Amino acid sequence: HVAKLVLDAFVWTGKDSHTLENRRKKLPDYISLNRRPIDRAFVQSIFDRDHPGTADQATISAFADAILTLDSSMPTGTYVDMCSKLPVVDPTQIKVPTLILRGEFDGIASLQDLIDFYVRLPHANKQFSVMKGISHASFQQKNYKMVYHILHSYLTMPDPIYEA
């Protein structure tokens, strides 16, 4: 049983996403290769793609060091799914309180796409938060404490006393 749901860096249909539009151009490659190479420049691009400066360079370097010790490539499945299978979630089927977190500069999910998802959520106890100065990877950003504050506040909010 899920009591509450939090969606962060969520992508619904990908509508109006310039990042996904660019990735779709390479979809045949992603499908045929199964893996794509990664290096330090790739990791840097994850943090600089949407809005350079939202993550601390020391965090980016530590993240790159950690993942590059594990592998030099990664599966293409998430790219294939985001470019060819969205949407994979039907908001009308989510029956629990839901919080949607979106970074101000998130270049993958457009604000309007997420608002369209939000208004279709049937549960009245729902929230939408746009986080200032954050791009897609909210927990690795300079403003990460704001993310934790919003998350903690939502998850510890008392249940409503009155429900019509």
Give the location of each predicted region.
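Active-site nucleophile loop of the alpha/beta-hydrolase fold
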Residues: 6-16
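Conserved alpha/beta-hydrolase "acid-adjacent" motif
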Residues: 107-113
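Alpha/beta-hydrolase
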Residues: 16-99
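Alpha/beta-hydrolase-fold serine-hydrolase catalytic core, especially in secreted/extracellular enzymes
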Residues: 142, 156-164
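Conserved strand-to-loop "acid loop" that flanks and positions the catalytic carboxylate
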Residues: 95-106, 132
